[in-house]
């Protein structure tokens, strides 16, 4: 059942018109990631796309302006992931700074309320005195919730980035770059990015109406909230296109300079990350999971409270609570992975090979962790995966992750068309989606999903591969180049961190921490001795003292320990030669 991993080198677009002063290595890396001109490398706020191109913004800011003037009770309804938490906190903080005092927030509980603006969540908002609801990172599929709000005379502004269905909810205003009639050039804004753009537009409208002058309020600097935008954008794994790179870089720069929310500072502390050396990967792999742990296992209100609090002492208490939840999440996930691999073995034995698309269910799985499980199994077997857990009412909740070549939401939409009623509801993106179905429909869904993936996907796309930026010359294997690469980001989804490959002599190898392989290597053609580490190796294969030469796929990195800096390579894949 071991997945064979192939190595492929990226193609470089030789027609890219990049600045001549860029180092040749960076020109190569940028050109192979679709960057075609200098303006796509802009990282200052002046390079941001203008909010005026987002459809629905003018209507939304007019509604909000009138709500501000009349003292209307505004309830922000968020989502229970990191994007939803940052969107919620940003919207509340921004509107407070803009002069709104009658504002509160509500985050649906994953286990009691489910996703989005449901009628039940509307009732909760109504009980809190809502006179206007603003959704963030949800709402585009909340037809019933919006209708229920209308029946209670509560207008709704929907801000979302998820893909819309054929019909839209009957909200007073909808802001979503993925609307069919929206001309916003970037379709990759996270929910927190959409919320930030709405707040920029609202600030401009309020200024033009004389709002700040009338009340003697200083016009707020909304750039102070870009730390939240960066965290939500990276944690939600949206593509880091040119506009998202600006938002992320600006937010990271504020965090590095110590100009961030106390909650983010506290998360960095519990994750043992130095703010001054922050990388985008720290947001995705250290802060994001801790924030997400609240929504996965408990209640995301803890995460939002952390991001909203102004006191570092209070923030540290909440961050430690999230850190403990994340540790529990890891333990739950580890057990679920073992069970999932057992299910894969059974599937393979019964069918001679794994299906092209995997739908998996275990009655003891935790619905807050199935998304991570789907990601892990997808990475291991390189095929679309949907993992289900019981919702406790005779239904299952599933979370899916896809690979390049299969649009997950489109696949679910096709299944819904072919087999009406098989799913209760679904939604999502190209690479991730969520759905629910009745428990007795699981086996049918498992079969139909596998068949659809087999029909839609070329078998070659199910072959695991590592995509490399090619070799580094010995002269490029230096601390200076490693620092250059670190500073050339932010790297992330659809703009991956540089990965190189090469042929090396394996001089030393030993296990550290049970499953990590520590090595010393030297380029076969001559070059510097390099320390390297490969994480979570197959200990049945490594170390192998009979192997003298290896092909490596690796990242050039700087190891910082007790004030000392040294060059090292992080090995993604190792092949004996």
Question: Whereabouts are the PLM-identified features?
Answer:
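Alpha-helical scaffold elements adjacent to nucleotide-binding pockets in ATP/GTP-utilizing enzyme cores
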Residues: 91, 121, 148, 194-201, ...
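A short acidic, amphipathic alpha-helical/loop segment
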Residues: 144-148, 373, 480
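A residue-level signal for conserved active-site and pocket-lining positions in enzyme catalytic cores
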Residues: 30, 134, 292, 485, ...
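Short alpha-helical basic/polar micro-motif
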Residues: 193, 371, 375, 552
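Hydrophobic helix-and-loop "lid/oligomerization" segment in the mid-to-C-terminal part
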Residues: 2, 8-131, 152-153, 204-441, ...
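Active-site cavity-forming subdomains of large catalytic enzyme subunits
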Residues: 123-192, 196-216
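Acidic-glycine-rich active-site phosphate/pyrophosphate-binding loop
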Residues: 66, 166-176, 264, 521-528
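Mid-to-C-terminal polyanion-binding domains and interfaces
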Residues: 69-70, 314-320, 324-360, 393, ...
């Amino acid at each position: 059942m071991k997945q064979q991993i192939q190595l492929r080198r990226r193609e470089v677009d030789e027609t890219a018109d990049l600045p001549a002063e860029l180092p040749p290595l960076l020109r190569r890396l940028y050109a192979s990631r679709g960057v075609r001109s200098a303006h796509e490398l802009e990282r200052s706020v002046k390079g941001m796309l203008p909010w005026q191109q987002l459809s629905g913004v003018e209507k939304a800011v007019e509604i909000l302006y009138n709500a501000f003037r009349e003292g209307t009770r505004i309830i922000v309804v968020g989502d229970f992931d990191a994007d939803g938490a940052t969107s919620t906190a940003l919207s509340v903080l921004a509107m407070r700074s803009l002069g709104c005092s009658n504002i509160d927030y509500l985050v649906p509980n994953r286990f009691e309320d489910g996703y989005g603006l449901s009628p039940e969540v509307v009732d909760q908002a109504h009980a809190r005195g809502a006179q206007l609801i603003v959704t963030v990172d949800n709402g585009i599929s909340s037809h019933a919730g919006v209708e229920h709000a209308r029946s209670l005379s509560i207008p709704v502004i929907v801000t979302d980035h998820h893909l819309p269905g054929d019909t839209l909810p009957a909200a007073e205003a909808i802001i979503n770059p993925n609307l069919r009639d929206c001309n916003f050039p970037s379709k990759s804004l996270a929910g927190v990015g959409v919320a930030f753009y709405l707040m920029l537009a609202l600030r401009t409208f309020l200024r033009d109406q004389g709002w700040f002058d009338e009340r003697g309020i200083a016009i707020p600097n909304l750039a102070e909230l870009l730390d939240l935008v960066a965290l939500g954008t990276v944690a939600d794994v949206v593509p880091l296109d040119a506009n998202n790179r600006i938002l992320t870089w600006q937010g990271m720069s504020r965090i590095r300079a110590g100009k961030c929310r106390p909650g983010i500072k506290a998360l960095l502390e519990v994750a043992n990350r130095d703010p001054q050396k922050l990388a985008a990967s720290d947001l995705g792999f250290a802060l994001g999971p801790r924030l997400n742990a609240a929504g996965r296992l408990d209640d995301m209100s803890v995460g939002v409270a952390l991001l909203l609090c102004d006191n570092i002492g209070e923030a540290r208490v909440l961050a430690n609570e999230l850190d403990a939840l994340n540790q529990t999440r890891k333990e739950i996930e580890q057990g679920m992975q073992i069970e999932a691999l057992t299910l894969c073995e059974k599937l393979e034995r019964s069918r001679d090979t794994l299906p092209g698309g995997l739908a998996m269910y275990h009655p003891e799985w935790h619905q807050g962790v199935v998304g991570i499980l789907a990601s892990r199994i997808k990475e291991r077997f390189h095929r679309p995966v949907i993992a289900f857990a019981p919702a406790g009412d005779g239904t299952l909740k599933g979370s899916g992750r896809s690979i390049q070549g299969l649009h997950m939401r489109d696949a679910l939409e096709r299944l819904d068309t072919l087999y009406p009623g098989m799913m209760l509801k679904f939604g999502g993106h190209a690479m991730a989606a969520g759905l629910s179905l009745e428990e007795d429909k699981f086996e049918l869904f498992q079969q139909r999903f596998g068949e659809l993936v087999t029909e839609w996907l070329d078998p070659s796309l199910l072959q695991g591969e590592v995509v490399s930026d090619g070799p580094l010359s010995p002269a490029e294997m230096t601390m200076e180049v490693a620092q250059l690469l670190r500073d050339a980001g932010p790297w992330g989804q659809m703009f991956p961190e540089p990965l190189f490959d090469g042929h090396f002599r394996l001089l030393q190898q030993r296990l550290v921490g049970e499953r990590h392989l520590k090595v010393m290597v030297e380029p076969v053609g001559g070059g510097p001795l390099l320390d390297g580490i490969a994480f979570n190796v197959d200990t049945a294969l490594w170390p192998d003292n009979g192997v003298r030469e290896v092909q490596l796929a690796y990242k050039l990195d700087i190891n910082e320990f007790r004030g000392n800096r040294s060059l090292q390579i992080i090995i993604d894949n190792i092949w004996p030669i």
